[in-house]
Structures are given as structure tokens and as C-alpha cells.
Amino acid sequence: MTRTPLIICDFDGTVTMNDNIVSMMKEFAPPEWLELKDGVLSKSISIQEGVGRMFGLLPSSLKEELTGFILKDAKIRDGFLDFVSFVRSNGLPFYIVSGGMDFFVHPLLEGIVEKERIFCNHASFDNEHIHIDWPHACDGDCTNQCGCCKPSVIRKLSDQQKFLIMIGDSVTDVEAAKLSDMCFARDYLLTECKELGLRHLPFQDFHEVKTGIENIGEVQAWLQKKNAGANLPR
């Protein structure tokens, strides 16, 4: 059976060069955010709790400043635009699943990735301090309080007929990487993939990811079958 590739891609630190939440906190948050960040990285507090409390340190009145800062500070990783063209032209199912917030994820991806292919958290600026809503929280099979739960999103999008490809970099990507058939990893996630013995390839830019995906046997088989079907006489 030829399985259909399904590509799930992180955003912060993967599509972008830096982690946008960390950049934002360094610029605007009081020192208390550092303890929360360390708690998330050490897994002593959940991602949902840590990130929610970090944003709770910021007054909602900063919305315009925060948005302007990220749109100016964030840099898209080399090769991403070509990579999106590659998956689109080949009909490869591709989704962004991000622990980031809609107020910066959507503007940064506008004109590149359709909104219906983006899963992320929602930041509310209605109260004195920023409040985070979690529209893609953990399902009944996950108790990790992930925030935007990548395994739960994957379970909605995937099944046994899918060949799951994960692209990521951080602690928020580890559980999704465990579900993947192939993981493209960098930074923290690369170390975790090595320690857990997961099938993976390192990457620094999306040119490497594109080449790596093109060389996966399962992807080649699916593309051959798809193209053969497209060339059948009607």
C-alpha cells in the first residue's frame, strides 16, 4: 500500500529563524518570564501553563507594539517560499501547526500559506492583560497540556494511510516527532530525536528539507503513483 505523505511543520524557530515568543518576551516582559521559560524547558510546568502565564505578564495595551515588533524582527528561514511552492505544485498535504499566536503567525504567513492550513493559538486583548485561548488543546489521548497540541491535530488530520513527516525545532515538537515516520529536526528537537532513536534528518534551511523529502522512498512512490494516475487517458 502506498501511503499519502502528510507534512506537519512548526512555525517559531522553524519557519522563522528565531522563536518569536522568546524574542517578544525578551523585549517586553518583566524578568518573571525567565522562570516560566525555564520551567517549560525542564518540563516542570506544562507548555500551556508556562506560555499562558508569560503572556499574562503583558498588558493588552501593547498589542500594536508587539505586532509591529514581530513583523519587523521575524525573519523567514531560507528556502521556505520555494518549499511551499514545491509542496503545492506536487499536491503534497502541508499544514503549519504552531504554538505561536494568531496575531503574528497569520500576518507573517499571509500570501504564503492559506489560513485554513494554519493551526495556532488565539491571543485575546480584551482584558487588562493578554489572555491566551487554546482552540487546539489536547484531546482525550493527551494529558500533557500542550497548548496547541500537535499530536491531537495530527490525529485529526492523519490515519494509518498517511506517511507523517514532521518539521520542527523545539520542546513543543517532541510529542509530534514521536508520531512521525520521518522528522526533519534542528536545535533541541534534533538532540531529542537522537536520544529517542527517532528516524530523522537534520536541517538548517528549507532547501535541505525539500531535498530530503524528495529523496524519501515513500514520497517518491506516492508521487509516481499520483503522476501515473494523472497521465492515464480519459
Swiss-Prot record:
It comes from the Bacteria. The keyword NADP does not apply. Keywords: Amino-acid biosynthesis, Hydrolase, Methionine biosynthesis. Signal peptide: none annotated. GO terms for biological process: L-methionine salvage from methylthioadenosine. One of its GO terms (molecular function) is 2-hydroxy-3-keto-5-methylthiopentenyl-1-phosphate phosphatase activity. Its EC number is 3.1.3.87. Pathway: Amino-acid biosynthesis; L-methionine biosynthesis via salvage pathway; L-methionine from S-methyl-5-thio-alpha-D-ribose 1-phosphate: step 4/6. SUPFAM superfamilies: HAD-like. Pfam families: HAD. It is an enzyme of class 3 (hydrolase). Disulfide bonds: none annotated. Transmembrane segments: none annotated. It catalyses: 2-hydroxy-5-methylsulfanyl-3-oxopent-1-enyl phosphate + H2O = 1,2-dihydroxy-5-(methylsulfanyl)pent-1-en-3-one + phosphate. Dephosphorylates 2-hydroxy-3-keto-5-methylthiopentenyl-1-phosphate (HK-MTPenyl-1-P) yielding 1,2-dihydroxy-3-keto-5-methylthiopentene (DHK-MTPene). Belongs to the HAD-like hydrolase superfamily. MtnX family. This is 2-hydroxy-3-keto-5-methylthiopentenyl-1-phosphate phosphatase. The lineage of its organism: Bacteria, Bacillati, Bacillota, Bacilli, Bacillales.
